[in-house]
Amino acid sequence: MARGVKDLELEIIHTPGHSPGGISIYIRKENVLFAGDTLFLQSVGRTDLPHSSAEDLILSIKNKLYKLPEDTVVYTGHGDPTTIGGEKRGNFFVQG
């Protein structure tokens, strides 16, 4: 799903795992992703909460977020930004 905000098109990506309704927002024109609590610098969102799912979280990251360009800058819900390529290479929570 895409929505426009002024000159930006926001792509809403359903990324369940941390929560069933989790989303990430990708701005292709700027090559940035707002990942919320799905993906962090060398980490992932918590899945020990009610209705969260580790399996769904990993699938969301591998099958959706890791399909974005490697140089996509990821702004996380907490902490420092990262890139999709950096996470593919260094995030041991999402290996395999």
Feature annotation, model-predicted:
Residues 2, 9-14, 19-96:
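Metallo-beta-lactamase
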